[in-house]
């Protein structure tokens, strides 16, 4: 019977960790991350859920003769913002898997 108490304790720890993970994920989803390109002339904001929230363009980068440059700047800013989300996700959620020796 001694092992049952240990098992219950482990289950409680797992439930607590699961709750903390859900709270951390919700907080992460509520955050916004900004990517910038062209010296701040293009700004893209994405949510922690990796959805584009806004795109802000300085008038000076809107050149009908050079749409490709504007497209490139938007891509760069978007990728930067998404990278920030990924880094924050890894650092936040990594706390929960650290030391578990999971096979994946």
Swiss-Prot record:
GO cellular component: bacterial nucleoid; cytosol
Subcellular location: Cytoplasm, Nucleoid
Domain of life: Bacteria
DNA-binding among keywords: yes
Chain intervals with Low complexity compositional bias: 1-12
Gene3D superfamilies assigned: Nucleoid-associated protein YbaB-like domain
GO molecular function: DNA binding
One Pfam family, short name: YbaB_DNA_bd
Location of the region described as Disordered in the Swiss-Prot/TrEMBL record: 1-22
SUPFAM superfamilies per record: YbaB-like
Predominant location category: cytoplasm
InterPro entries the UniProt entry points to: YbaB-like_sf, YbaB/EbfC
Keywords: Cytoplasm, DNA-binding
Biological function: Binds to DNA and alters its conformation. May be involved in regulation of gene expression, nucleoid organization and DNA protection.
Similarity section: Belongs to the YbaB/EbfC family.
Assembly and interaction partners: Homodimer.
Protein name (database record): Nucleoid-associated protein Bsph_0039
């Amino acid at each position: 019977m001694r092992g049952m108490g240990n098992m219950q304790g482990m289950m409680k720890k797992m439930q607590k960790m699961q709750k903390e993970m859900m709270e951390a994920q919700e907080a992460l989803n509520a955050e916004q991350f900004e990517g910038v390109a062209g010296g701040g002339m293009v700004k893209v904001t994405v949510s922690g859920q990796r959805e584009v929230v806004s795109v802000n363009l300085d008038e000076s980068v809107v050149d009908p003769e050079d749409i490709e440059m504007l497209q490139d700047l938007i891509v760069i800013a978007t990728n930067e913002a998404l990278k920030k989300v990924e880094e924050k996700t890894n650092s936040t959620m990594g706390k929960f898997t650290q030391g578990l020796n999971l096979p994946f």
